[in-house]
Amino acid sequence: MDTSDFNFVFLGQSVLKYQVPLDVYNTINHIYETKYPELKPANKQLVGKIEKEHSLFFNGEDSNKMTKHNYLPDNVLGWFEQKFKHYLEWNKIREYNLHFNSVWINTMFENEYNPVHVHQGTLFTGLSSVMILKLPESY
């Protein structure tokens, strides 16, 4: 596997930084911008103090907060899965059950934030990722 597209920092638990392919980046932005009116608000299931949180993918248990749905094409989901598997291999985690649960977009404005929180899952560490899609010109 080619590993030239990432870097790492040890902070107790490893943090890996990947370069997102332009087609994945453009696809996610395009879906968000064109499907925005259809996207389910994700606020009920997220801890962020953010007004605009919308789900692009959910594969968890259906509840009153969220039901299964998918707006992402296979190449985008496959890219995430490939990176999560690489993360596990990098950390020498050999036995795991990978369950890709959710993808959402936070559109954040001044004074909005994500508090410190824990993501739960069956893997002892859980996996989480963040992708910055757009920054204001004044940033």
Please provide the spans of the model-predicted regions:
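Non-heme Fe(II)/2-oxoglutarate
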Residues: 1-95, 111-114
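Hydrophobic residues on conserved beta-strands that form the core of alpha/beta folds
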Residues: 100-102
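Catalytic core of non-heme Fe(II) oxygenases with the double-stranded beta-helix
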Residues: 104-139
